[in-house]
Amino acid sequence: MLGANGSGKTSLLSCLTGYLTPSSGKIEVLGREYGKTDWRDLRLEIGLVSSSIRQMIQDDQLAIDVVASGRTAELNRWRPTRGSEKVAALEALAQVECADRAKRPWAYLSQGERQRVLIGRALVAQHRLLILDEPCAGLDPVARERFLMFLERLATTALAPNLILVTHHVEEILPCFRQTLILRAGSVLYDGPTTRGVTSIQLSAAFDFPLQVRRRGGRYALGLNGDSASGG
């Protein structure tokens, strides 16, 4: 999902996760329509990784406890993780390549590690849909690329949930994201295959500025006036 600030991304996410009701139209998620199914049950199948969740986790929470909390939809557990919860949390940490960080407090995890742990939290909850709301915010270029490569590996696993990436940056769009929604001023500007949507023409319209999009090896780059571009 792409769009400038104020394009409607946050409002749409709030609708998708059941926290905001639209004034018109309908919302269908995972084959079920809000209003015709219990949204509380449907929301349990949707995971969200965002900066707001990161900020609510206390510094002394261990990575394994953060992950285990996904099973019970809670934050900042006061009890140790044991038994089947521990087994499931360790498996999820291994899947997000953070098994060696299980006993590390939240305060001592890097931003990239925190993002992986939160994805592990979503995996242990067995969400069918995982929304990543600007997951690379705050990461330096190296950490961002490492996180994106991890995300690409995760997307190819058999147990991976459906993924939605919300971003401002075309550099973060991986080949695994085959469909793209572009918003502009609260309306849908484009909805379809990523290769046809992430183009100079579409993004120039979305950001109301002349932009140049380049594509190489399945990845995208964005430039301003004067950069050579391909794909539209």
Predicted feature descriptions by range:
Residues 2-4:
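The feature captures the beta-strand-to-loop junction immediately N-terminal to the Walker
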Residues 17:
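Helix-to-loop junction immediately C-terminal to a conserved catalytic motif
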Residues 25-35, 42:
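Conserved ABC transporter NBD signature motif
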Residues 105-109:
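Conserved ABC ATPase signature
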